[in-house]
Amino acid sequence: MSDQDKFIQMVLSSGPQFQKLLQVIGRESGLSEDLRIVFQKLESSTLPVSDLVVKNIFESERANYDWVSYELKPLGVGTMAQVHRAKVRMNGKIKSVVVRFLKPGIEKRVYEDKRILSEIAPILDSNHVYLASGLPKLTPLVEDLSKTIIAELDLKATVDRQNMGYRVYRGSKTVDLGGYKNILKIQVPQVYWPTTPTKLMVQDMVFGKKLEKVSQQYESVLPKMKKAVAELVAEVWIEEVLFKSGFFHSDLHQGNFMVEFREDETKVNLIDFGMGGQISSTTQGAALALGVAVELLKPETITESLWDLSEQAHNLLLKTQFRALVDAKVLNIKHGLESGVKVEDWVAWAIQKGIKFPFIFISLNRGFGIINNMLKEAGSSHTLATISKKVGLKYALNIAKDLVDNESVTAKELVKLGLGIKKVPARCENIFMK
């Protein structure tokens, strides 16, 4: 057995939180090709539960669902859940559906994993060798990861998020796929939730393949398909979270949307709403102010925005102390001692310094990175910066009013950034500038 295979077996024998952590790392940019291949193998090597367990799960739900048939072989297997094809009778009609359930016993493993990692993290954080390595503190990372994993245990919350996605993630656009025009249509499968308690999530069967496979299949005749799909998904996502309801899917990597190509219309089905949420208009405004402040390297507004976004009562330092740290960091950037950083980097840095952000904002921050990485993997020349600028053209007046009225920046500073009324949406570019 090769060292690579040994590593994979070791990870598969570990707890769900550690596996999830490695999956997140595997989706980050900057990994070597060897590591990328290892993480891809890990994601495709997750073991399913036995056929007998699957059968018992389906049969125990007959009071909720009138099964016509179901497949014991899983359609897909994840760290915590798996999905199966089935047919169910509803209102006298037979529907093809996909059934998702959490693996039996996974909740116990999640909390056991949390206990172990929570004990190990502070020990490593205080180890002089680890401290000298310059690596980030593990304790806040473990806390955030635990919240993410535990949130996925709430099946009803996942259903609620998918129902929200079903309502708001709608968009279609005629695009050039490379010498061929086609309509791209974004949609989310409908969920069927019974009135009595259930452990299953039953949703419409959607067809299609992962974007990578579809784009490879049609690469010779539709060379721009991969980029076009990724860019439309990013447009719909960023418009909803920044300019509309504030709702977001925080894990929209390429594995979480299925593409069904047809000559007249290509359907892009967004799936797996285990992670996500909805931010308030106040959070939207604070995030926008932070983005502009980061671009201006304006320490007072960076401090105010990060502090406003945080759980202030739980921060481990005073606001004056945090302001001093921000001042020093800005000075280092201006003197070339540190490279310029994005909003996501400022948030990660603040966490390491003891700022406590609500889980919803951390989840959103992760979503920013996932979308940016998705665009990069698709070979798009766009980033969230340029996508946001394009989408923001519809909201120019509101953007200008919010930023100036909240005294986050002055009108003169907006002009300095090229953010006159006609150009205000460019502020989105400043938020996600790389």
What residues fall within each predicted segment?
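Broad phosphate/nucleotide-binding scaffolds in NTP-utilizing and phosphate-metabolizing enzymes
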Residues: 1-249, 254, 258-285, 290-434
